[in-house]
A protein has these predicted regions:
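Short glycine/serine/threonine-biased micro-segments
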Residues: 31, 199, 288
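Solvent-exposed, well-ordered amphipathic alpha-helical segments
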Residues: 14-18, 22, 26, 198-199, ...
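Short linear motifs at secondary-structure transitions and domain/linker junctions
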Residues: 62-66, 215, 254
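Short, acidic/polar
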Residues: 17, 67-77, 169-188, 224-227, ...
Length: 334
């Protein structure tokens, strides 16, 4: 297996992922690849000799090669087996820290060194430029695959949450600095730089976390709008990912519907304004995380806090809510 070193006999297993991708292809669904590098969800043994829990940590050079080969193998597997099915890969997920003390003081990118008290192993064993390197590796594989098959058309994205946050450490602006760094990392040989990152994925959990207070706040729409426009100024696309308009009170459905309508209209207006200026609308994809209500969730459940039990456009019985009707009318008018 190409991504392992001489002491590493590990083999990739795509069985579960293949079953999901095959189902999507059979049903005419496009796929977002998520995610190639994420510090929160990569096993410690990935960084050790022989991929063994008790192995010594490998050198930075070995880890760079390991990450490169891992990214290449994953992307190549799915593109060769399901040509054209994947429209985008989230190359790196949630690498920007939320708070001071979680990143180096002199790092304008705010690349996280710790998460919840645990160190970022990519940062520790590859280096502070692991994000840029991951994008370079993904770009090289993408170019190889596109040269081999005209069906391949993959965009490379950086994905994160709280992307519209300007409080505290100002995550929005740090994300911009990170993407700037990625897109000025590799020379194109002609005095410019290769555009390694095509866009920013905006995880969009909007509203109070785990509580009704803070939900359906129009100021959040303003922050979202400002963030999208800032990202577009830096010549990248925007994908709205994991959209969930939080709502913890079923009786607040009228307010939820009105807020969803304003949000949908804001997305439309942003693209229309760009088009009126002779540009392409920056929002090129939208994925809804909270599509259906889930009133059965316990208040202690992570999904209860993250999404809200009444965040859906549909009820738990798959019936369209007023929120769906309002969003549909906004989109149908375009």
């Amino acid at each position: 297996n190409a991504y392992v070193d001489e002491n590493s006999p590990a083999v990739m297993n795509f069985t579960k992922a293949d079953s999901m991708v095959a189902y999507a292809v059979e049903n005419g669904l496009s796929i977002r690849g998520h995610v190639l590098a994420w510090d929160a969800d990569m096993c410690d043994w990935f960084f050790r000799e022989g991929y063994k829990k008790d192995g010594a940590y490998v050198s930075a050079d070995v880890m760079k090669n390991r990450l490169k080969m891992y990214i290449d193998e994953v992307m190549t597997h799915f593109e060769e087996k399901y040509p054209g099915a994947i429209y985008c890969w989230d190359v790196v997920n949630e690498a920007v820290a939320d708070n001071a003390g979680e990143f180096a003081d002199d790092d304008v990118r705010h690349v996280r060194q710790v998460r919840g008290g645990k160190t970022n192993l990519f940062y520790d064993y590859i280096g502070s430029d692991y994000v840029e390197l991951a994008f370079r590796y993904a770009y090289e594989t993408r170019e190889k695959l596109q040269a081999a098959n005209s069906k391949t058309n993959i965009k490379l994205f950086y994905n994160d949450y709280n992307t519209f946050a300007t409080y505290g450490a100002n995550k929005r602006d740090a994300i911009i600095q990170l993407v700037k760094s990625v897109n000025s990392f590799e020379s194109d040989g002609n005095g410019g730089y290769l555009k390694l990152c095509d866009g920013i994925g905006m995880q969009s959990y909007i509203g109070g976390y785990g509580q009704q207070s803070g939900c359906m706040n129009d100021n959040d729409i303003t922050l979202v709008k400002n963030a999208i426009e800032k990202f577009a100024e830096n010549n990248v696309e925007v994908h709205v990912t994991e959209l969930a308009v939080r709502n913890y009170d079923n009786d607040a459905e009228p307010e939820h519907a009105a807020f969803y309508k304003k949000l949908a209209q804001t997305y439309v207006d942003i693209n229309k304004a760009a088009q009126a200026a002779g540009k392409t609308g920056p929002i090129t994809s939208l994925s809804i995380w909270g599509l259906f209500d889930a009133p059965y969730l316990s208040t202690a459940d992570y999904s209860y806090k993250m999404n809200g039990p009444y965040c859906g456009l549909f009820t738990e019985l798959y019936q369209p809510k007023q929120s769906f009707k309002e969003v549909y009318e906004v989109l149908a008018a375009e």
